[in-house]
Amino acid sequence: ICYPINCLQIYFIKLAYMDVSSILIVLPLLIIFSYLFDIFARRTKFPSVILLVLTGIIARFITSLYGYDNFAFLDNLVPVLGTIGLILIVLEAAIELEIKKEKTEIIIKGFLAALIILVINIVLVSLFFNQVIGLPYPTSVIYAIPLSIISSAVAIPSATGLITKNKEFVVYESTFSDILGIMFFYYCIRQAEKGEALIGIEPIITLIGQIFLIIIISIAITYLLFQLIQRIEHHVKFFLILALLILAYEIGKDFLKLPSLVLIFIFGIFLSNFTNLIPKGLKKYIKTDKVGKSDLHEFHLLTAESTFLVRTFFFLFFGFSIPIESFIEFEPYIIGATVLLIMYGIRYFYLVLVLNDEDSKPLLYFSPRGLITILLFLSISDYDIQKSNIVDEKVLLVI
C-alpha cells in the first residue's frame, strides 16, 4: 500500500499550484484509494476511516516540508463536508432499518443502550474533566458530550462482518447515540449561553416539547416529500429530495434550534417501511402505488454512493487539517487514554450486566468516535461559552 500512497502525496504537494489536469488526476486517485481502503477494512476489520485520516496527516506533513502551509480553507470545508456526511449516513442507516413487530426487541435494546451508555459517559467524563483537569461547570459537560457519542459514520460500515443480530444492534445503537448526543449537546449549549443550570424542570420540559415538535414537523415534511416523489416525472428526482432534506435540516437546526437529525431519521425509516408504518385506516387516503421497490433501491443506491464520496473527502481533509506536531506532546495521550478507559469500562459493564450474551462480546469494540464527535467538538469554539486550552483538538485526535 505504501508505494501508491507515496505517489499520492506527490500530487498533494502540488495542491497550491494545481491546474485542471492535476485536479482530474488527484480526485479520482483519492476515490480509488478510499475504495481500496474499504476493501482492506472489510477483510481485516480495521476501520477504513483511520486509513483515510492517516493518509491526510501524511499528506499534510509532506506538503509542509515543501513549504506549503496555507490550510485556512479547511476551516470551512471540513464542517460542510461533515454536516452533509452526517445527514447522508443517518439517512442511509435509517433506510436500511426494518420496522417490524419482530424487530421491536432489538430496537428497544439499541435505544436503551445508546441512552444509558451515553448519559453515564457524559457524567463520568465530565466529572474527570471537572475534578481532575479543572474544567469549570458546565464547560466540562459540553466537552464531554461529543466525546461520549458513538459515531454511526464509523460503527455502521465497520459492523458489516458481524452476525445479523449484532449488526442491527450496532446500527440502532449508533444512530440513536448520534441523535440523542446532538440533542443533549445543543440543549447544553443553549443553557450555558443563557447562564442557566443544565438540569431543571423548565428547561427539561422545553426540551421534551422540542422533541415532540420536531417529530410532528418531521412527519409532516416526510409526508410532503413522499407525495412529491410520486409526482415528479423528471428522470432526476432523488437529488432534489436530498437537497430539500439538507435544506430542512439546516433551517431546523440553525433557525428553529430543533434537533433536525430526527427529521432525517424519520424520513429514512418511513421511506423504506411505509407499507408497515401507514395505518390500515389511512392507506386508502395516502397514495403509495407510484413508489416501488426499484425506486427505493435507486434512492438507497444514490444515498450509499453519495455517503461514500462525502465520507472519503471529509476524513481525508480532516486528516489534512491535523499538523504532525499534534503527536509530540504527551499530555493529550494521558487525557485521551483516561477518557477511553472510562468509556470502554462503562460499555463492558453494560454489556455484561444487561445483555449478558456470548454473541454480544464483539460489541464491546464497536464504540468508535468519529464524524459527529469531530463536528460537535470543533463547533464549540463558535459559541459564547468558556473554552478549554487543555481538552483540545489534540485530545480529540487521540480519542
Walk through the language-model features, giving the residues of each.
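Transmembrane helical cores of multi-pass secondary ion antiporters/exchangers
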Residues: 12-399
